[in-house]
Design a protein with these regions (language model features):
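Residue-level signature of catalytic and energy-coupling elements of molecular machines
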Residues: 26, 78, 157
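Flexible beta-alpha connector loops of hexameric P-loop NTPases
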Residues: 14-18, 61-70, 113-118
């Protein structure tokens, strides 16, 4: 299992602290996996302009940065980590509040925060489809209410044949654990 946490600047925009609940969920999920499913693995990655893996012990100290949202970089790293694991339970939980706004093209950042940029969106959707072909389900936890962003998440979810939850910050943890349990049981049977 890979948990992707969005640390782009929008995670603290407009007076809403979305990063603190995301960190709490990540810590609780890691505890659940370690105690109830000790044979499973949990890799935690964060993504902004780039994506990188962090240690579980570093989750409480996560901070957002002046980053855009490079969902592609996060998915690429998650896929790479899952390919190296022998566990049958290959899934990605992605906590995000917004649209993808950044990719790397020809070694340079290509960014666009205005609307949904088709170049960025198409690359993101292509990776969602590639995850599906590899048997990697993506569960997206959307913690923003914008209808056009929800439409993007719906398209992303359909492409991957994964799941999406549109949730408030309060109910975020319940959704993750319910879905993890459901996926876990299905993979064990």
């Amino acid at each position: 299992t890979v948990l992707m946490i969005d640390i782009s600047h929008s995670m603290i925009l407009y007076g809403e602290d979305r990063i603190t609940p995301a960190k709490k969920v990540a810590m609780a999920l890691s505890e659940l996996i370690k105690t109830k499913y000790p044979k499973d693995t949990l890799d935690v990655i964060v993504f902004g302009n780039d994506a990188w893996q962090i240690e579980i012990k570093d989750i409480p100290y996560l901070q957002v940065g002046p980053y855009h949202t490079n969902t592609v970089a996060g998915l690429e790293l998650a896929m790479d980590l899952l390919r190296r694991r022998k566990n049958p339970n290959k899934q990605i939980f992605m906590i995000t509040d917004g649209k993808p706004t950044c990719i790397v093209r020809n070694g340079k950042y290509y960014k666009n925060s205005f609307g949904l940029d088709r170049i960025i969106v198409n690359k993101t959707l292509n990776l969602a489809a590639h995850c599906r072909k590899l048997g990697i389900k993506i569960t997206t936890f959307m913690i923003a209410q914008d209808s056009y962003l929800q439409q993007f998440v719906e398209e992303f979810t359909q492409t991957n044949q994964g799941k999406a939850f549109y949730t408030s910050l309060k109910g975020l943890g319940d959704y993750i654990f319910e879905d993890y349990e459901r996926n876990r049981r299905r993979n064990v049977r």
